[in-house]
Amino acid sequence: SAFGFAGQKCSAASRAYVDESLFDEFVERLVARTEAIPGTSPLEPGGFLSPVINSAAVARYTAAVSDARLTGRVLTGGERLTDGHHERGHYVAPTVAIVPDDSTLWTSELFVPLLTVRPVATLDDAIERANAVPYGLTAGLFADDDADIGRFHARIESGVVYVNRAAGATTGAWPGVQPFGGWKRSGTAGKAGGGPYYLQQYL
């Protein structure tokens, strides 16, 4: 869910907090999967990689990548794509980066295909970091412990929450069909739930 639509989706994943005991293996697999994304045109069968919308988005991407390189590490991606069919659009490579805690990449909405990753010691640490941003539209968790899942649901400041959704960790709701709205600067604390009459339309 980080790189579909070139990250230009309001629910695209932009941050991943990973249990420190799994971090190295997770990053290795993430980088391998990212580098295996087909570079074919989105108009062709099997095409996945879309262009960003305009030159301003390319500039946002370029600035974010430069910041990641200056303060942290770009693990894969980080380039403008201009070969073949990429020459006629604003194509940029899906990017994975490790950046310090004070980087603005943790707290900015970029709408480009860039995912930051960080190890955490505990679920509570991950929740606190996830909540320490001005946005709260979607969040996702992969866990097998019911108590951890319950704690995440209770504490995460996000309007839409997914658990163990392999097809997209932070995306998948159908706006207009399912409740879809956010907290903080992503909405107004849950009004997208539909109010007192929302549930009745399903009865």
Model-derived features: positions:
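ALDH superfamily catalytic-core signature
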Residues: 1-101, 124, 128, 163
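Conserved C-terminal structural/oligomerization subdomain of aldehyde/semialdehyde dehydrogenase
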Residues: 1, 34, 38, 50, ...
